């Protein structure tokens, strides 16, 4: 077995950012990075936004001006973790007679046959696309290999069905339609983006997708493959089901966090299916209210408990980019027997590009909150999510780049009270809406 101070399991954005944030924070010990793919770490948003126009991988080191091979002590490519085991504390390790290096607290075995002992393990294992078991003929879009297969199926104009009207589904729909393909979207909820924005505002986003057929409140109950066509069975809310065949069918049903490693821990109660790994605001894994020392989770596999925003759900690029700063600081503080420093965390931020349209969401939209919309044009508006006493919890910005900086500043310290009378006034800058500095 081999010792490493920090073992980072997963080499997506959150994983490599953890490596670099540790170095930036002054960590001088060894860092091992396990990359489950053969390809160097790459960016995922371009897979849906630029599938046909950018076939090459957008490597994160190039895109973010990083040098991960220099920052990590060891990188193991095409290597996944198999088991995670807690190591009992060395009985002779005391404050007066510490071991020669940080005491290993976790042991990880891998598909490459290695056995790593680590003082800290960071789970950045990501997530995989959800696909019902019987849908073998359906494409997904989560990895470079997924993108390559889908691109190969779309070399000529095709009729494409996209099952799922979340961010990835509508980004892909707009992109493919712009490149000559005929698109049909099936969504089980009443509108596109209903889970993310609420039905009213998801319906408004749908107006940005002209010439795309959209079936909402419609469940796909069966998918079969017949020669070079794929047939779906659709069940609307009322009336009989129907069938339709397509050249290509893509499932955009969300993602399931990779939490398998926790099943090998006797301390960890089984997580509900599809649930992310629970962590506190510094990324420390927390099971049944108890922090597991030296075990951390970040990125698409984890949900963090934030004191201002509540549970920060996974799946957002900006969260994977920024959260490792707090995690690295917590690791450094732990090694120095100190409390993590108070590091400001930006408001949660989701961004999307739907064809020519740019969308930003700052904060956490609550569907039971009041919404007020400031309209600039038919394709440009800002929606504010707030309580009855004008506590602002989220801002949705559609095609209004001048408002993004203001929204970021407005929510920089968490939900804030605003002047509700000025929300619809297009002449009032967003940054001036706060009523309680």
Please provide the spans of the model-predicted regions:
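Mid-to-C-terminal Rossmann-like scaffold of FAD/NAD(P)H-dependent oxidoreductases
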Residues: 2-4, 301-402
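Beta1-alpha1 glycine-rich phosphate/pyrophosphate-binding loop at the start
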Residues: 2-73, 175-197, 406
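FAD-binding core/adjacent interface of flavoenzyme oxidoreductases
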Residues: 2-9, 66-159, 233-240, 248-253, ...
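Glycine-rich Rossmann-fold phosphate-binding loop(s) that bind the pyrophosphate
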Residues: 10-13, 142, 163-166
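N-terminal Rossmann-fold NAD(P) dinucleotide-binding loop
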Residues: 15, 169-170
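FAD-site-proximal beta/loop scaffold in flavoenzymes
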Residues: 136-157, 243-320
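Rossmann-like dinucleotide-binding cores of NAD(P)H-dependent redox enzymes
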Residues: 159, 172-222, 346-350
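C-terminal catalytic lobe of FAD-dependent flavoproteins
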Residues: 242-271, 357-437
């Amino acid at each position: 077995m081999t010792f490493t101070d920090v073992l980072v399991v997963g080499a997506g954005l959150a994983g490599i950012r953890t490596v670099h944030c540790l170095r930036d924070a002054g960590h001088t010990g060894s860092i091992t990075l396990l990359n489950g793919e053969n390809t160097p770490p790459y960016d995922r948003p371009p897979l849906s936004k630029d599938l046909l126009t950018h076939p090459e991988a957008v490597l994160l080191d190039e895109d973010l001006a990083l040098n991960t091979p220099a920052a990590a002590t060891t990188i193991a490519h095409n290597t996944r973790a198999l088991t995670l085991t807690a190591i009992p504390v060395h009985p002779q390790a005391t404050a007066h007679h510490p071991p020669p290096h940080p005491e290993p607290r976790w042991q990880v075995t891998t598909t490459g046959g290695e056995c790593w002992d680590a003082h800290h393990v960071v789970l950045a294992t990501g997530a995989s696309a959800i696909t019902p078991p019987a849908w073998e003929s359906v494409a997904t879009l989560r990895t470079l290999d997924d993108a390559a297969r889908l691109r190969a199926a779309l070399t000529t104009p095709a009729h494409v069905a996209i099952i799922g009207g979340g961010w990835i589904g509508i980004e892909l729909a707009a992109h493919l339609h712009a490149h000559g393909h005929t698109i049909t979207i099936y969504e089980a909820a009443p509108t596109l983006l209903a889970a993310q924005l609420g039905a009213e505002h998801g319906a408004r986003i749908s107006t940005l997708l002209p010439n795309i057929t959209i079936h909402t409140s419609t469940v796909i109950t069966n998918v079969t493959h017949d020669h070079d066509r794929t047939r779906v069975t659709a069940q609307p809310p009322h009336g009989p089901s129907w069938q339709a065949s397509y050249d290509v069918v893509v499932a955009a049903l969300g993602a399931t966090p990779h939490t398998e490693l926790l099943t090998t821990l006797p301390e960890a109660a089984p997580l509900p299916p599809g649930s992310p790994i629970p962590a506190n605001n510094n990324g420390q894994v927390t099971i049944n209210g108890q922090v597991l020392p030296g075990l951390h989770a970040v990125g698409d596999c984890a949900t963090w408990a934030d004191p201002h925003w509540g549970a920060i759900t996974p799946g957002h690029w900006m969260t994977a980019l920024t959260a490792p700063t707090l995690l690295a600081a917590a690791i450094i503080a732990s090694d120095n027997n100190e409390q993590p420093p108070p590091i400001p965390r930006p408001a949660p931020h989701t961004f999307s590009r739907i064809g020519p349209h740019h969308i930003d969401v700052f904060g956490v939209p609550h569907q039971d909150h009041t919404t007020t919309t400031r309209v600039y044009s038919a394709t440009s508006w800002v929606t504010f999510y707030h309580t009855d006493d004008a506590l602002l919890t989220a801002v949705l910005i559609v095609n209004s780049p001048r408002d993004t900086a203001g929204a970021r500043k407005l929510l920089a310290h968490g939900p804030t009270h605003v002047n509700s009378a000025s929300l619809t006034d297009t002449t009032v800058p967003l940054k001036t809406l706060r009523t309680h500095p």
